[in-house]
Curated annotation (Swiss-Prot):
UniProt-listed Pfam families: Creatinase_N (PF01321), Creatinase_N_2 (PF16189), Peptidase_M24 (PF00557), Peptidase_M24_C (PF16188)
Catalytic activity: Release of any N-terminal amino acid, including proline, that is linked to proline, even from a dipeptide or tripeptide
Name by which UniProt lists this protein: Probable Xaa-Pro aminopeptidase P
Residue numbers binding Mn(2+) 1: 424, 522, 536
Source organism (scientific name): Paracoccidioides brasiliensis (strain Pb18)
Entry cofactors: Mn(2+)
EC top class, as a word: hydrolase
Coiled-coil parts of chain: none
One Gene Ontology biological process: proteolysis
Main function: Catalyzes the removal of a penultimate prolyl residue from the N-termini of peptides.
Cofactor note: Binds 2 manganese ions per subunit.
Gene Ontology MF: a single term: metalloaminopeptidase activity
Keywords per UniProt: Aminopeptidase, Hydrolase, Manganese, Metal-binding, Metalloprotease, Protease
Amino acid sequence: METVDTSQRLARLRELMKERNVDVYLVPSEDSHQSEYIAPCDGRREFISGFSGSAGCAIVSMTKAALSTDGRYFNQASKQLDNNWLLLKRGIESMPTWQEWTAEQLEGGKVVGVDPSLITASDARSLSETIKRSGGSLLGVQENLVDLVWGKDRPCRPSEKVTVHPVEFAGKSFEEKITDLRKELEKKKSAGFVVSMLDEVAWLFNLRGNDIPYNPVFFSYAIITPSTADLYIDEEKLSADVKKHLGDKVSLKPYTSIFEDAKALGQSAQAEVNGGASDPPRKFFISTKASWSLSLALGGANKVEEVRSPISDAKAIKNDTELEGMRACHIRDGAALTKYFAWLENELVNKKTVLNEVEASDKLEEIRSKQKNFVGLSFDTISSSGPNAAVVHYKAERNNCSIIDPEAVYLCDSGAQYLDGTTDTTRTLHFGEPTEKERKAYTLVLKGMIAIDTAIFPKGTTGFSLDTLARQFLWKEGLDYLHGTGHGVGSYLNVHEGPIGIGTRVQYSETPLSVGNVISDEPGYYEDGKFGIRIENIIMAREVKTTFSFGERPWLGFEHVTMTPLCRKLTDPSLLNDAEKKWINEYHSEVWEKTSGYFAEDELTRNWLKRETQPI
């Protein structure tokens, strides 16, 4: 991982701040749609700080600069940040939050500036209150200052073609989805909903794009009212097939006209109030993740209502077609991973081939690309050997990566986009003789993964409540990991999908798990500079039968869909109880049954799979 000298960039940014009377400038990670993964043109935080992780916030004052990120990226950030930057480790008690650190810089009534399109309206309000208590004020700076520093070197905004996602994969027409949304809006007496999240627009209209790497979304907004459906998108992105798909049920408008139209809607609502309507005027809804800019355009906090997105909740509960697609694509994807691991072991151990991390991941992509319905990867493959496996979101650079050491742990976290689903699988392997500590760590992580997989819980339980099941065995040894245990997964959409998850984030306590949720199960353990362990399966929430039904509530459990062998060499059977051994043996029997047919004429892979799925 290379460190970028940010001195000149910071100096130029501070010049621009001074010209605009801004004392502290915030650079969030997100784009104007609050996307977790962004297009290169929106990589402002990475440009100004040198840190390339997917989460974090940069804060620049006239004399200092700080970068806040979470536990997934502590190791990576410490390597990528140069001496201009202070690393604020989120969640560490001795460290201030980035909001607290910002407030500490504000003595004497200073001004904090931020691009209002890059933070949510609710975050702007809470940040403003924090800043006020320190004597400062928050200013929305319409012109993005990092863009000015970046200048002509900033990548252009993508404008890739949009495609139709057929109902044979979506399971429901876009007309039905809009009808369902309108019913929800009517229940809440809303004038309409402004859709700002890219995956929500894609899901609602059964469309997919390619504007953000690995995420099949496209730059757009939408406004849905009781009688209209407007899609804000650059029309050159739309083929004749897409226009035919939308028909006369959707009005197409330029992407950049959303704020002008939002302002007009806000003024119309205000005119209704001024006209003394007998009924309370209906407000437009925006998601709690919508930008401060969008809220201001609609008239601000008193004129617009921020709500949990009804689209986000609907999208998280997969229909039967989507669930069947997830099962099918994970079998094919599991076969691809099995072929890759068999190939990799043969190259490293039998042929003594020298392979680096990128060469290996290239081979995996080649194998995956031959699978039915393959579209592309769902994220940048994490192919990490030895100490690199301790970097949770490690990225091997093509011209600067490690040779895979057969005598060290190898962690591979990878996934793909298929027309019928999205995959995300992590396996940790060893091609030599693992140490006792590596085997123990792996087995403790495996026990946690099994505990989530086999959990049974009453309807209404959240992922926040389940999280300790995955950590309990590590905790007994005084060990832990600094990332969530699971995230929601889209259906040929974003591999990280809200609002559900398993972990300690506040939002995971707000959304109960429901039948049809698709979520990852991925505990881990990492020792900086030594090795890392992570095991990840994708699981789907379903209703289960129990002997009793306390409170007459439905009870839920999980169905795993990932079909890839676990690592026998790293598993210590002496640390497993009988139920866990039974689970592993039954899982491996299922993997063999569902994937071995792919290798009828591939003796190498078939033999590897047979060996790895033998009972323990």
